Amino acid sequence: AMSEETVTRLRRTLAHVGKARLKDVPGLSSGRIPTLADAAALLAAMLKHLRSSGTIVSAYGLREGLLYERLSPAQRAADPLIVAARDEGRRSGRFPEHGDLLDRWIAPLFGDDRRADARLRIAACHLADVGWRANPDFRAERGMEIALHGNWVAIDARGRAMLAQALWPALGGAIDSPAPLAILAGEASLRRATQWGLAI
């Protein structure tokens, strides 16, 4: 999410940064650079006109929004992270549909999980077997890579770190957090995710 102030600051910055310098920004498509400043100005104007206090930026675009409009109410109500984790578990795991069973089994241990964290735990259960095709010495790394770099939606950096931390011990890694995770999530969050992973 970006506040109105952040969008205004982005617009001002892009108005003064040369296109040559923008080409050095990692992950920024060179095809978008010529229109980036105009897009930021348009976004700022839209926020002002709509009197919106902020915006949420989607990694997906207009096409996906049009597709979303065609979904049934039940499909729209589904949690996109859980749906994606379930699909990945079906594709990459040995035992399709085990994620829901696994979560029902361990959920009583974590009755105090906040709703936002419970959905991360459910996603971790769906991904619990994604590393089985990897060499046993690298299954934990495979799980962590999928959690951190998977094409997930409706999840932030903390959530990705918690998913990775849950899969790390579940797939044979040590209890300690691998290097990048402590930057993305706090100690209490990673400790809870470790507990999920050990239960898994």
Segments the model singles out, each with a brief description of its role:
Residues 1-200:
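Helical "lid/coupling" subdomains associated with nucleotide-phosphate turnover
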